[in-house]
C-alpha cells in the first residue's frame, strides 16, 4: 500500500518552516513506499525527494482537493495530521440549514464551503470534524479539521476553526429530548456560517490550541504510526 505525504505551503508561510517540515517527513517516511508532495500557490525550490503540486483552488480545503486529484497513492497523510483514503469522496450536496445525517453534511461552496461529519470519540460523546470543500460535487472530500468533542449535556457549539482559523461556524445538533449522542441511531446537524474570512485574535487561537490541538495531537500520532505500519 503506497502512501503520499502532502505538505500544504502558502507564500505567506515561513520558508524555513517548509524545509523543516520536509526534513521531518523525509526522516519519518524512511522505507515508506510513497512520495512526498508540496501543494503550494507559489513556485518554491524543493529537494529531489519532494514533488511540487501547483495549487489551483483557493484555501486550505482547495489545496487538499488539488492534492487528492494529483496523487494516486492509496493513502494520503497531510502534514497537519490528517490520514485519509483519498478516494473516499462524498456524494451528498445540500443547501444551508438543511438537516442531514450527522456523518454526511456538506455546505455549498461560496455560501459556506465546509463539510462536517463525526467520529466516535467517547462512549457518550462525538467528535465533529470539518474542512473546506470545492464547488463541484465530485471534488468534495471527507478530510476534516478537529473541532471539539461535544458532551451529551450540550446540543450546540459556536466556536470552530480551520487549520489557519479563517472562519467561525455554528453547529447545532438536533435530537429527541433525553437521547444521548452515541453510535446508535441517526442524529442530525444544522450549520450556519457566522463570520467570513476573519482571522482569530490571540485569545481565540490560544483557546483553539489549549482545547483542541493538544487533545488531538496524540490521536494524530497514533493514526500516522498505524498508517505507516500498513504501508510497510
From Swiss-Prot:
It comes from the Viruses. InterPro entries: Nucleotide-diphossugar_trans. SUPFAM superfamilies: Nucleotide-diphospho-sugar transferases. This is Uncharacterized 26.8 kDa protein. It comes from Thermoproteus tenax virus 1 (strain KRA1) (TTV1). The lineage of its organism: Viruses, Adnaviria, Zilligvirae, Taleaviricota, Tokiviricetes.
